[in-house]
């Protein structure tokens, strides 16, 4: 056993040393790239094409890591028998070795390195024209970004993969998997699974003469709504072009007038009704030591509500009750719905299949409540 442990230790040290050597060999000096083009100081939305239908921005990854790692629950989780057993098994050893190799390549602790690498933000985008995905990482330290590029390529070479590179307009594109390409553009790092999307982003980076997501009408309106909302503790902001997806026939079941599931109607009925008309949806993820909150918003008009308007209750009471604050709360849901009328008039809301299932449940519940009608007598008490 001791010999095996020593052997593994030697192998790990060898692996790290080899990784560092390969990283140093691969990484290009920062000044080997041409000077950044004029006016290159931009944001990700000014580089992405206008055909982007979904994007999410992580503005402060360093802050997220700090909040999670210093969370009051961390000590409790680490004291749990499951966690203690996992650590004793040696399973996290490879992860720890990888972190040490990453720190050695970056020349600083991993948290500090990730914070610096992403201090300009991370943007993930989906393109409508070809389904391509692009990830843009913006850093204030181009030298550290080049070190990271070298680290990724070194990992690929250690796995036995042959180095594959190609040049486009003076930038080197590296294959980091069978479908994923990586390009460093000065203080930007681009990852994409679609060559044409990558070329469009590089063209815009150099030329700045095409329509972009920043000029997309739906995105401009969504960005204004996000800017007007409370940005406190926001760690992720997102945009989804519902109209483009709806017109393209994507996820047709989501945009149907009626759904199969009553529980889904209770929780999402009003949202789904709105999705059939709204041009876009925005999302915000907020993180504090008290918890995680997801907020979704979309443009709305009163004439979109029929036939569901009645089932939300009286208009002057159209606000969901405040969530109950109880110790150790893991999940809570508050919704503003007239459950009794929803149940009684389910034919207006659910498909035939959903109504058949509801009829079976109604019979069973009426029997359980000694013959009292569940929709009228029981749910009516909640109105």
Roles of regions detected by a PLM:
Residues 56, 173-206, 333:
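A short, solvent-exposed beta-edge/loop patch
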Residues 14-28:
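Bacterial N-terminal signal peptides
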Residues 188, 207-209, 220-222:
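Mixed-charge (acidic/basic) macromolecular-recognition segments
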Residues 18, 29, 130, 183-186, ...:
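Short, solvent-exposed loop/turn segments at the edges of secondary structure
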Residues 1-13:
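N-terminal secretory signal peptides that target proteins for export/translocation
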Residues 152-158, 198-216:
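A short alpha->loop->secondary-structure connector
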Residues 33-175, 217-289, 293-383:
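Structural boundary/hinge residues at secondary-structure and domain interfaces
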């Amino acid at each position: 056993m001791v010999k095996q442990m020593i052997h593994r230790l030697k192998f790990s040290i060898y692996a790290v040393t080899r990784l560092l050597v390969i990283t140093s060999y691969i990484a290009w000096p920062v000044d080997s790239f041409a000077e950044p083009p004029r006016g290159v100081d931009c944001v990700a939305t000014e580089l992405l094409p206008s055909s982007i239908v979904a994007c999410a921005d992580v503005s402060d990854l360093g802050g997220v890591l700090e909040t999670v790692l210093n969370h009051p629950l961390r000590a409790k989780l680490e004291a749990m028998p499951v966690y203690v057993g996992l650590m004793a098994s040696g399973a996290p050893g490879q992860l720890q070795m990888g972190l040490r190799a990453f720190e050695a390549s970056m020349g600083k602790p991993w948290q500090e390195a990730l914070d610096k690498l992403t201090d300009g933000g991370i943007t993930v985008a989906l393109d409508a024209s070809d389904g391509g995905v692009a990830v843009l990482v913006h850093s204030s330290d181009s030298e550290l970004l080049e070190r990271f590029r070298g680290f990724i390529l070194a990992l690929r070479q250690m796995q036995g993969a042959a180095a594959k590179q190609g040049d486009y307009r003076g930038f080197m594109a590296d294959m980091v998997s069978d479908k994923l390409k990586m390009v460093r553009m000065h203080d930007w790092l681009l990852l994409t699974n679609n060559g044409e999307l990558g070329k469009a982003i590089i063209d815009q980076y150099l030329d700045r003469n095409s329509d972009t997501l920043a000029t997309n009408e739906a995105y401009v309106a969504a960005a204004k709504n996000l800017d007007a909302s409370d940005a406190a503790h926001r760690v992720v902001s997102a945009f989804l072009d519902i109209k483009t997806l709806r017109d393209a026939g994507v996820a047709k079941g989501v945009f149907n007038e009626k759904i199969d599931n009553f529980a889904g109607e209770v929780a999402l009925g009003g949202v789904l009704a709105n999705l059939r008309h709204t041009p876009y949806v925005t999302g915000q993820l907020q993180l504090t030591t008290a918890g995680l909150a997801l907020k979704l918003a979309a443009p709305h008009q009163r004439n979109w509500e029929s036939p569901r308007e009645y089932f939300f209750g009286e208009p002057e009471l159209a606000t969901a009750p405040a969530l109950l604050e109880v110790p150790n709360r893991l999940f809570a849901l508050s919704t503003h719905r007239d459950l009794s009328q929803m149940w009684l008039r389910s034919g207006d809301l659910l498909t035939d299949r959903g109504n058949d299932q509801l009829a079976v449940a109604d019979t069973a519940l009426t029997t359980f409540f000694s013959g009292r009608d569940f929709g009228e007598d029981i749910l009516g008490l909640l109105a």
